Amino acid sequence: MRAYTSLVGHILGSHPEIDGYYEMHRSYMLADDLDRQLGQYAAHDALKPGSRLLFDKLLHNDYTLNLALPELADATLLLALRPPAATLPSIVALFAQKDRDDLYATPEGATAYYVDRLAALAGFAARHPGRFHYFDADALLADTPRLFAALERWLMLETPLAADYRRFSQTGVAGAG
């Protein structure tokens, strides 16, 4: 949610152990959803030889995650937030670009959206303590080496992350988040 997730996704997706870099707009409620995610990703981008992680972003409350699935038992979840002073104008600007009038294109609508998202994330965190790693999104720009070290540790990467990243088939495509 306006927390540099496109940049994070591209940095992670450029790593040889990680496939995926964009928002796939899906929930993960059944094991079949994970297979569909893999198929959806592979339809646009080749899977890397030796990759072991598949990345997605769940940026909105519309998408749910069933952590009771055995297939997600060892999933690594990352939560990132950006302060409201930067996030709210970004939400307004994003939704003001849409072709239709959008509630989130106003400061009031953006604030309601942000508060709802925070409440959903707080609820998720309360229900799943110890199942996620949190970082301040601004650390990506303000303290990149420390954040990269934490991400490498959390994801158990064998090689370091790099600030340079690839352009992929869905880079810059509207709706790919």
Annotated model-derived regions:
Residues M1-R52:
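PAPS-dependent sulfotransferase catalytic core
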Residues Y4-G9, Y28-L30, Y63-L65, A86-S90, ...:
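Short catalytic/ligand-binding loop motif for oxyanion handling, primarily in non-cytosolic enzymes
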Residues E23-A31, D35-R36, Q97-Y113:
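Lumenal/extracellular "mature" regions of secretory-pathway glycan-modifying transferases
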Residues R36-Q37, L59-H60, G109-R117, D143:
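Soluble or luminal CAZymes and related metallo-dependent hydrolases
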Residues L47-L67:
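Glycine-rich phosphate-binding loop used to anchor ATP phosphates in small-molecule kinases
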Residues A73-A93:
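Conserved phosphate-donor/acceptor-positioning beta-strand/loop module used by diverse small-molecule
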Residues A126-G177:
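The conserved 3'-phosphoadenosine-5'-phosphosulfate
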